[in-house]
Regions:
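Non-transmembrane, aqueous-exposed alpha-helical and coiled segments at domain scale
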Residues: 2-147
Length: 147
């Protein structure tokens, strides 16, 4: 099998190392817009975690969305990939989906960017969250959790 050497791949990696509020959402949206305007295929890959993430994007027209499952490049029409290390919460996913129906993306979802989910991603349900809260409440040495 021949290896192609004529393909140029431009990859931008955004890493938060300050416990949040570093502008990861804003930077993802900016880079996605820049790449799409240049005619490049653009996909946002979420590395890990789940719906507790909250990456805020504010558009020039004032529209604001906090991304949980969809990548922060979604409003720029960048696709999203949720890998096996991402924990999907179907209820929060649908809530976010419904919020995005009223976004500048519009209600015609055939024009939306695609979202790909690894078949090995974990699923979190309200039962899981309730169970974790009960366990945490009864620990002798609590370590805290996201919800």
């Amino acid at each position: 099998m021949a290896v192609r050497t004529d393909i140029i791949i431009d990859v931008s990696i955004i890493i938060g190392a300050n416990y949040g509020d570093e502008g990861k959402g804003r930077m993802s949206d900016y880079l996605a817009n820049k790449a799409i305007q240049a005619g490049q295929f653009t996909i946002t890959i979420l590395s890990n975690g789940g719906a507790q993430r909250g990456h805020t994007v504010v558009l020039d027209n004032g529209f604001t969305h906090i991304f949980h499952h969809f990548g922060s490049g979604t409003l720029a029409v960048a696709d999203t990939y949720l890998p096996q290390s991402f924990i999907v919460n179907p209820m929060i996913f649908m809530k976010e989906y419904n919020e995005l129906l009223n976004s500048p993306l519009g209600r015609d979802t055939s024009l939306w960017p695609k979202i790909f989910v690894s078949p090995e991603s974990l699923i979190s349900t309200p039962f899981d969250m309730m169970n974790n809260q009960i366990i945490e409440e009864h620990r002798t040495h609590r370590h805290g959790s996201c919800g």
